[in-house]
């Protein structure tokens, strides 16, 4: 029983005996008897790396525990039964009164009796630590190691300094040569030789940066048949080189795993990677199209289109391919969304020209399809019909028009236009006549080609509509306030028929000023006297009062069917007393333009014409509304300086602080910002572009600060 107790760890079965504050220095003595267990023994009079040194008298420090509280004891006098070889777990019995100094129990042979005992797990740990401490550190004393221990009172031994020249010449990365078996080296050399021979056999010269064919993917067919033959020969040579050799089966495992994760089989992915020299993109393209190139049989035909940004390897794969009837790859899809290539240009041009001669059948054809196929340019686009606006940069007003036209088809006209829903038969008749007469007038701002004028449209009253529609459908103001109101109620009268507007605002502040369309360039009515269809256009002698002028340079701005961007902006004309006539040549140009491409269908009223107040003289410091070129909207600005030519001025946009040079015709007084609301009057009227008015407010909104740009 006693033996079992001695061999048991006291921390598991011991009873608390030592006071809690024995380590605090306040306890002066401990009254025995008591049994404590040795946890650790250390000779504090010798260095730790040589505790058995006899240079100084031995003084042992013992870590003792009663199973709950640990304390430290000092060998005050020599203990005969305790040494450094006494294992932890040994039990000692303290007799009498044990003096305590600064938390240390003072032990000697008179108050200490060794009972013995062996705690197995404590002894194993202790023996392991002792065996490891015997290992000497071999790098002591050499370069880079710790300095050797020098006993106190002795001088440091001088170590011979290492020659710096020897250090410079020493190779720090000297590796011991490992002799490999002869057979392994021979096999490696054979593989290496085979790989070199395979590369040399292909004799393929690498040209970086695209070589002489850089940019051929951007110019379809630019290389010609000669380039195709050269590339086919290179492809055949490359394919033959792939078909033999030691490493022909090796593929990039990472690329293989990437393709298999997309759902392709491992064998198909491996074959595709082998066919395209581990080019992941080319391999994916071949797998997506389902046509794997056969290396030995030469380049097969592949049904892929040439998109933007194609690599040369992909170009080689499709040299002899024919373009599919529909987009079959990602590149075909991107090609339809990005850039304007010649193929798509011809396709869209042919579609737009075919629409010139076909008549609309219903509202969907009149509205939605025209939005998809007509050219709605932005303000800075001013080329002919061979150039299109960016596909992804439609102004917000066009998007609103599409939504509004769809709303009209699904829900009917807005409820606020009750006066225009009086008779469905009148509406149908008006729509039919509207489609006949107005298709000679495209809605977009860009001037197209003036050279196409079908004779059939001349017979259908295209001349008449091409003159009336700019006044009616483009949101221009014509006549004074009373005349316009009268015109709304009397649709078939001959007083102001060509100058009324759809969804028009009557600004009473400018009753004496008359507005014109950007494309109206005639000053008399001689051309229109023999027009048969009075429903499409009516004019009388009062038409001569509405002299239309080109604000900037008159007829000289039109040349070869093109007009400069600045010349396209017109504004209100001086009062009736101003007499400026344009030439008959301008009239013919206008009609040719208006009949070049016909469109019909619901169109929202466009931004009212930018006003040029001809009689207004600007001075530096004047506040105004200036047109900003990017979004084609008016913002509050201040005139900073006027150009000596009298055509432009430098303005500072008040809310943004940036300076821009603006044409004087694109500057108007600050009072022109106000718009007056008009009541619900008028019936169905020509110039509505196939749809009743949706709003009495102009498309050009009031000033709203745009979002901050990055």
UniProtKB/Swiss-Prot annotation:
CDD domains: Tudor_TDRD3, UBA_TDRD3. Keywords: Chromatin regulator, Cytoplasm, Nucleus. This is Tudor domain-containing protein 3. The Tudor domain specifically recognizes and binds asymmetric dimethylation of histone H3 'Arg-17' (H3R17me2a) and histones H4 'Arg-3', 2 tags for epigenetic transcriptional activation. It comes from Xenopus tropicalis. Residues 206-227, 288-328, 369-515, 678-710 are annotated as: Disordered. GO terms for cellular component: cytoplasm; nucleus. Residues 453-471 have a biased composition (Polar residues). Component of mRNA stress granules. Pfam families: RMI1_N_C (PF08585), TUDOR (PF00567), UBA_7 (PF22562).
């Amino acid at each position: 029983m006693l033996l079992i107790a001695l061999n048991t760890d006291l921390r598991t079965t011991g009873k608390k005996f030592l006071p809690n504050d024995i380590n605090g220095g306040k306890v002066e003595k401990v009254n025995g008897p008591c049994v404590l267990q040795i946890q650790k023994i250390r000779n504090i009079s010798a260095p730790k790396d040589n505790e058995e040194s006899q240079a100084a008298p031995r003084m042992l420090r013992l870590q003792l525990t009663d199973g709950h509280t640990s304390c430290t004891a000092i060998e005050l006098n020599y203990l005969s039964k305790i040494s450094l070889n006494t294992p932890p777990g040994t039990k000692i019995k303290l007799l009498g009164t044990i003096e305590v100094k600064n938390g240390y129990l003072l032990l000697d042979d008179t108050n200490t009796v060794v009972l013995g005992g062996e705690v197995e797990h404590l002894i194993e740990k202790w023996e392991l630590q002792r065996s490891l401490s015997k290992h000497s550190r071999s790098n002591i004393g050499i370069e880079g190691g710790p300095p050797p221990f020098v006993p106190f009172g002795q001088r440091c031994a001088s170590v011979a300094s290492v020659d710096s020249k020897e250090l410079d010449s020493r190779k720090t990365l000297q590796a011991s040569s490992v002799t490999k078996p002869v057979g392994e080296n021979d096999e490696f050399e054979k593989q290496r030789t085979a790989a070199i021979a395979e590369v040399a056999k292909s004799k393929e010269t690498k040209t970086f940066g695209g070589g002489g064919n850089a940019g051929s993917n951007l110019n379809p067919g630019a290389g010609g048949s000669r380039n195709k033959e050269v590339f086919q020969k290179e492809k055949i040579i490359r394919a033959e080189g792939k078909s033999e050799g030691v490493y022909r089966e090796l593929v990039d495992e990472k690329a293989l795993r990437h393709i298999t994760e997309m759902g392709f089989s491992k064998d198909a992915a491996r074959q595709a990677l082998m066919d395209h020299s581990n080019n992941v993109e080319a391999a994916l393209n071949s797998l997506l199209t389902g046509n794997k190139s056969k290396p030995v049989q030469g380049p097969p035909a592949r049904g892929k289109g040439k998109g933007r940004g194609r690599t040369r390897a992909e170009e080689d794969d499709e040299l002899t391919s024919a373009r599919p009837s529909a987009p079959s790859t990602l590149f075909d899809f991107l090609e339809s969304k990005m850039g304007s290539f010649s193929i798509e240009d011809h396709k869209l041009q042919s579609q737009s020209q075919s629409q010139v001669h076909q008549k609309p059948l219903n509202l969907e054809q009149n509205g939605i399809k025209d939005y998809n196929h007509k050219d709605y340019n932005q303000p800075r686009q001013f080329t002919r019909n061979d150039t299109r606006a960016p596909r992804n940069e439609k102004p917000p007003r066009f998007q609103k028009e599409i939504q509004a036209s769809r709303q009209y088809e699904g829900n009917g006209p807005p409820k606020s236009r009750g006066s225009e829903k009086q008779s469905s038969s009148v509406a149908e008749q008006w729509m039919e006549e509207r489609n006949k007469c107005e298709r000679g007038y495209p809605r977009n701002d860009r001037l197209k080609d003036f050279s196409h004028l079908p004779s059939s449209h001349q017979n259908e009253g295209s001349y008449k509509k091409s003159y009336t529609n700019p006044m009616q459908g483009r949101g221009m103001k014509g006549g004074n306030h009373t005349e316009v109101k009268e015109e709304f109620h009397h649709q078939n009268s001959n007083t102001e028929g060509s100058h009324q507007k759809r969804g028009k605002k009557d600004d009473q502040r400018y009753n004496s000023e008359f507005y014109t369309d950007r494309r109206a360039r005639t000053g008399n009515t001689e051309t229109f006297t023999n027009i048969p269809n009075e429903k499409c256009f009516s004019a009388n002698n009062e038409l001569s009062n509405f002299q239309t002028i080109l604000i900037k340079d008159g007829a000289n701005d039109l040349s070869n069917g093109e007009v400069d961007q600045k010349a396209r902006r017109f504004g209100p004309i001086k009062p009736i007393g101003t007499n400026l006539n344009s030439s008959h040549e301008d009239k013919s140009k206008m009609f040719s333009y208006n009949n070049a491409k016909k469109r019909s269908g619901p169109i929202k009223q466009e931004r009212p014409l930018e006003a040029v107040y001809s009689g207004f003289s600007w001075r530096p410091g004047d506040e105004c509304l200036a047109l900003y070129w990017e979004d084609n909207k008016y913002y509050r600005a201040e005139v900073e300086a006027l150009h000596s030519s009298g055509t432009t001025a430098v303005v500072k946009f008040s809310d943004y602080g940036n300076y821009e040079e603006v044409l004087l015709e694109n500057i108007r007084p600050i009072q022109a910002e106000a718009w007056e609301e008009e009541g619900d009057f008028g019936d169905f009227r020509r110039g509505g572009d196939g749809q009743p008015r949706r709003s009495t407010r102009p498309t050009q909104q009031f000033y709203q600060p745009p979002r901050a740009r990055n």
